[in-house]
């Protein structure tokens, strides 16, 4: 009887252990199956969430590239128009009067810039043939457009060796502080350049010239 009771007791213990082990296996199997079932769901949700996200990223990148291209194009157009725009000569309300065709009318004076190169005497003759004279600078205020001139042009200013003065074609003396005379080389004639500067030049040297006609 003791032996049978011992076997029953051991059997009960084994059954208990088996039952516990079986429960552990079931729990482990359930956990594994739950994870396997959960993973596809999670992956599916990830894919569902990732697809709109990457689509949005793609749209954002495309719009960014398009914006950069548009900015580049507009910048190029703006710079091109900026560097190619013509210099506008300011106009005043003062009466200018009639000028020859294609001449510039500004503050009661008519101006023409000639691109052909002539010596001083030939330039003077060309202006006289058009009822005008070589440029005479008499006022920085009334002739402020001359600040726009960038190259050298003959003007009607000559040096008088006998008294060392500079005179205009009409015989008037150059007013002090009106022009800065710069000796570029030996000569008795003067070229006009920018910022009210006069450059001494040999009268026989070919240069472009400016003709001027008073309207009053």
From Swiss-Prot:
Induction: Up-regulated by interleukin IL15 in primary NK cells. PROSITE patterns: C_TYPE_LECTIN_2. It is a single-pass type II membrane protein. Glycans are attached at residues 131, 163, 202. The keyword Transmembrane applies. GO terms for biological process: adaptive immune response; cell differentiation; cellular response to lipopolysaccharide; defense response to Gram-positive bacterium; natural killer cell activation; natural killer cell mediated cytotoxicity; negative regulation of GTPase activity; negative regulation of natural killer cell chemotaxis. It comes from the Eukaryota. Keywords: Adaptive immunity, Cell membrane, Differentiation, Disulfide bond, Glycoprotein, Immunity, Innate immunity, Lectin, Membrane, Receptor, Signal-anchor, Transmembrane, Transmembrane helix. Residues 1-51 are cytoplasmic. Disulfide bonds join 96-105, 99-110, 127-211, 189-203. Residues 98-213 form the C-type lectin domain. GO terms for molecular function: carbohydrate binding; identical protein binding; MHC class I protein binding; MHC class Ib receptor activity; signaling receptor activity. It holds the Pfam family Lectin_C. The chain crosses the membrane at residues 52-72. It is found in: Cell membrane. Expressed in natural killer (NK) cells, CD8(+) alpha-beta and gamma-delta T-cells. Expressed on essentially all CD56+CD3- NK cells from freshly isolated PBMC. Expressed in interferon-producing killer dendritic cells (IKDCs). GO terms for cellular component: cell surface; external side of plasma membrane; membrane; plasma membrane. Its main location: membrane. Residues 73-216 are extracellular. Functions as an activating and costimulatory receptor involved in immunosurveillance upon binding to various cellular stress-inducible ligands displayed at the surface of autologous tumor cells and virus-infected cells. Provides both stimulatory and costimulatory innate immune responses on activated killer (NK) cells, leading to cytotoxic activity. Acts as a costimulatory receptor for T-cell receptor (TCR) in CD8(+) T-cell-mediated adaptive immune responses by amplifying T-cell activation. Stimulates perforin-mediated elimination of ligand-expressing tumor cells. Is not capable of signal transduction by itself, but operates through the adapter protein HCST. Some families of ligands for human and mouse KLRK1 receptors have been characterized being very similar in structure and highly likely to be orthologs. In humans, an additional distinct subfamily of ligands (MICA and MICB) differs structurally, having an extra MHC alpha 3-like domain. Homodimer; disulfide-linked. Heterohexamer composed of two subunits of KLRK1 and four subunits of HCST/DAP10. Interacts (via transmembrane domain) with HCST/DAP10 (via transmembrane domain); the interaction is required for KLRK1 NK cell surface and induces NK cell-mediated cytotoxicity. Does not interact with TYROBP. Interacts with CEACAM1; recruits PTPN6 that dephosphorylates VAV1. This is NKG2-D type II integral membrane protein. It comes from Homo sapiens (Human). The gene is KLRK1.
